[in-house]
A protein has these predicted regions:
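Short beta-strand elements bearing conserved aromatic residues within extracellular beta-rich modules
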Residues: 121-123
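Active-site-adjacent substrate-binding region
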Residues: 1-94
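Edge beta-strands of extracellular beta-sandwich domains
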Residues: 166-177
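Short beta-strand segments within Ig-like beta-sandwich modules, predominantly Fibronectin type-III
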Residues: 134-141
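Beta-strand-rich modules
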Residues: 146-168
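Conserved aromatic anchor
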Residues: 106-118
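Hydrophobic core positions of the immunoglobulin-like beta-sandwich fold
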Residues: 100, 112, 144-148
Length: 179
């Protein structure tokens, strides 16, 4: 989301695969230990230059060498990391408890613990088949009813919004709210 806002020329695209076929990535050890980790890469790799031992074969130079580093692109990747880290650093704390209700109802009810010093909150929801938060509603309250939204058809989450507009990470409901 932040990259789309601040660096739209990067045209980010999420690939929902843990890793590339037959190769590893720097993010994998983080994933293996339970941490979130993503791999940022050029989508159109040059296989004579990347992931090759340095050699010459049939008059073709193979190998990862300094002369093939695209420093303008590397600078942009560094900016992508900085944008996302800054956004997280400037964001408020996330709500600790998020309750969800709406079992056998035509509406979804959400309430959450107050986060001190925030401007408001954003309620997110998405289809169960979607990897991104496609819908949202802003509120300054700590409880909200999404009318006409059926609990079984979506995933839900809540983030805190700081005075500066930065949002915390989205928290999935972790408690049931019974009437």
């Amino acid at each position: 989301k932040n990259v789309n806002i601040y660096m739209p020329e990067m045209n980010p695209m999420m690939i929902y695969r843990l890793d590339r076929f037959g190769r590893g990535g720097h993010h994998r050890p983080f994933n293996d230990l339970g941490f979130a980790g993503i791999r940022i890469m050029e989508a159109h790799e040059n296989y004579t230059q990347q992931h090759q031992d340095i050699r010459i074969e049939n008059n073709i130079k193979y190998g990862d060498t300094f002369e093939h580093v695209n420093f303008k692109y590397a600078k942009k990747l560094t900016a992508v990391n900085a944008i996302n880290l800054a956004s997280l650093a400037w964001a408020p704390e996330a709500p600790k408890e998020v309750f969800i209700g709406g079992i056998v109802e035509a509406n979804v009810r959400l309430k959450w613990s107050e986060v001190k010093g925030v401007k408001g909150y954003k309620i997110y929801w998405r289809d169960t088949t979607s990897p991104t938060w496609d819908h949202s509603r802003y509120t300054e309250k700590t409880a909200f009813t999404l009318e006409g939204i059926v609990i079984d058809n979506f995933f839900f989450g809540v983030s805190a919004v700081g005075e500066n507009g930065h949002e915390s990470v989205v928290v999935f409901p972790n408690k049931i709210w019974r009437k």
